[in-house]
């Protein structure tokens, strides 16, 4: 196990990484600082299909240590620049806080005498389409140290692995030779989460300070805008599409839509109204299938009750953030009673 091997010789491993990152070759003579000996290793790839098909990538343990070091130093600096209502992968924020915040806005819009509308923005294959050149330009505006930029570029543009997809192509259907080297971020990297927020902060700032949108909220690439005039909202959409195309080199997909604010708003796995936050049907379906699978393993004697209980408790913890009285009763009737009887 590479993790245990690294930890067993932690001091030596850290010194080795330090030397590679600080440009000293083995003979102790300083080398060219722009040609350090640190290179990102090869990625391990894994296909996952829930909640949707994706390629998850993982680096070796030493490379993850380097990522963590840069993340700890850089993320707090960039986080200060983010807007209040950006909720993805930030300390003290998350899906629950994002849903709760949006729900406080919905009554203000749906109760007004003037009809409000909701713009739901969905960026096509966001993590697979981030442009490396654009990302480096954004980073270079805030980071002046060329040595740090050089190492970040190695994380962003890996010479051994392509992260990008051609427009309109699904990851599970893309041939290896068709993957793109100058686009995309590896799903699974800690730094990818940071870069994803930094990249779309350009859109956040544009919407808040140029378009003066008050009710704007984002969780990664899931974005909601509330606005009191439908025609003006179409104009806002056109301005956003222009920025995405000309400056960020991104596109919106067909899920992008404008709907009346009195209809349930779909956001981060939920249907949100002024009175309820309901778990999306697809999420409920996956949850029931998983519980049914776990229940079958338990009844066949293939897993212990502790494993079943842990799964059930995790789902109960998830459900408590939704308006889900009937759903909770159904789970208890369908699964918990039978499982506890069998235990």
Where are these regions (language model features)?
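Surface-exposed helix-capping loop/turn segments at secondary-structure junctions
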Residues: 27-32, 80, 209-215, 248-252
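A common structural junction motif
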Residues: 143, 241-249
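Right-hand nucleic-acid polymerase module
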Residues: 59, 68, 172-182, 205, ...
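PAPS/PAP-binding and catalytic site of the sulfotransferase fold
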Residues: 70-73, 237-240, 244
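Beta-rich nucleic-acid/ligand-interaction surfaces
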Residues: 89-98, 224-227, 258-262
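Conserved polymerase palm-domain catalytic core
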Residues: 13-16, 20, 42, 105, ...
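A generic structural signal for residues located within well-ordered alpha-helices
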Residues: 61-65, 191, 195, 263
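Conserved two-metal-ion catalytic palm core of "right-hand" nucleic acid polymerases
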Residues: 1-138, 143-144, 160-163
């Amino acid at each position: 196990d590479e993790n245990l091997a690294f930890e067993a010789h932690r001091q030596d491993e850290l010194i080795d990484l330090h030397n590679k990152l600080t440009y000293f070759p083995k003979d102790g003579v300083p080398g060219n600082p722009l040609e350090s000996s640190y290179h990102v290793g090869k990625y391990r790839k894994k296909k996952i299909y829930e909640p949707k098909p994706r390629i998850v990538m993982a680096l070796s343990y030493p490379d993850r240590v380097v990522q963590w070091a840069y993340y700890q130093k850089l993320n707090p600096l960039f986080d200060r620049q983010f807007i209040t209502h950006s909720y993805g992968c930030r300390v003290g924020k998350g899906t629950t806080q994002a849903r709760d915040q949006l729900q406080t806005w919905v009554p203000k819009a749906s109760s007004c005498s003037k009809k409000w509308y909701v713009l739901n923005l969905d960026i096509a294959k966001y993590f697979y389409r981030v442009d490396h050149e654009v990302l480096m330009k954004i980073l270079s505006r805030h980071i002046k140290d060329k040595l740090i930029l050089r190492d970040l570029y190695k994380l962003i543009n890996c010479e051994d692995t392509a992260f990008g997809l051609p427009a309109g192509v699904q990851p599970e259907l893309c041939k290896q030779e068709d993957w793109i080297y100058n686009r995309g971020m590896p799903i699974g990297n800690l730094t990818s989460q940071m870069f994803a927020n930094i990249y779309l902060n350009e859109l956040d700032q544009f919407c808040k300070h140029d378009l003066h949108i008050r009710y704007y909220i984002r969780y990664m690439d899931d974005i909601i805008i509330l606005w009191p005039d439908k025609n003006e909202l179409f104009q806002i959409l056109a301005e956003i599409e222009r920025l995405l195309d000309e400056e960020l080199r991104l596109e919106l997909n067909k899920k992008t839509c404008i709907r009346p604010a009195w209809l349930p708003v779909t956001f981060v796995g939920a249907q949100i109204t002024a009175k309820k936050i309901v778990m999306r049907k697809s999420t409920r379906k996956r949850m029931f299938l998983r519980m049914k699978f776990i229940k079958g393993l338990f009844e066949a004697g293939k897993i212990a009750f502790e494993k079943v209980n842990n799964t059930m408790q995790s789902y109960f913890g998830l459900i408590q953030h939704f308006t889900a009285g009937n759903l909770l009763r159904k789970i208890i009737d369908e699964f918990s009673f039978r499982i506890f009887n069998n235990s």
